[in-house]
């Protein structure tokens, strides 16, 4: 006859957060062993892609004591938060905005010079 099993924790419903595995102990008994949820890993909020170079862990395992800083981040601006393509887009956009401001300023100065030349 098969041995009956009971949950070892108080949470008694078969939910996603209460998944278990049947394991045979060295004494020959069957027990429930709780399994951890699979980690999906960090995603870029802009592109939705996975961030390269960071391990897929549960959120609590990214804490200081469990994972060193160089494993938690990537060595660039917004490292470990945004994907490389999103960072590249941001840098290019910022550069183009600055260039546009400079062009606007130069055009304004040229227009002012033309007005002065027309008056005199």
From Swiss-Prot:
Domain of life assignment: Eukaryota
UniProt entry tagged with the keyword Aminoacyl-tRNA synthetase: no
Keyword line: Ribonucleoprotein, Ribosomal protein
Secretion signal, residue range per the UniProt entry: none
GO molecular function, one term: structural constituent of ribosome
GO terms for cellular component: cytosolic large ribosomal subunit
Coiled coil stretches, renumbered: none
A GO biological process held by the record: translation
InterPro entries from the UniProt entry: Ribosomal_eL34, Ribosomal_eL34_C_sf, Ribosomal_eL34_CS
PROSITE patterns: RIBOSOMAL_L34E
Family affiliation: Belongs to the eukaryotic ribosomal protein eL34 family.
PANTHER family: 60S RIBOSOMAL PROTEIN L34
Protein known as: Large ribosomal subunit protein eL34
Record organism: Nicotiana tabacum
């Amino acid at each position: 006859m098969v041995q009956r099993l009971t949950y070892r924790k108080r949470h008694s419903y078969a939910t996603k957060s209460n998944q278990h595995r049947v394991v045979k102990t060295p004494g020959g008994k069957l027990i429930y062993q709780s399994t951890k949820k699979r980690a999906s890993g960090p995603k870029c909020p802009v592109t939705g892609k996975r961030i390269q170079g960071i391990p897929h862990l549960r959120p609590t395992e990214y804490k200081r004591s469990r994972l060193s800083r160089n494993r938690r981040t990537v060595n660039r601006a917004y490292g470990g938060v945004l994907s490389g393509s999103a960072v590249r887009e941001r840098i290019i956009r910022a550069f183009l905005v600055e260039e546009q401001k400079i062009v606007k300023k130069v055009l304004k100065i040229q227009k002012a010079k033309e007005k002065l030349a027309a008056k005199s």
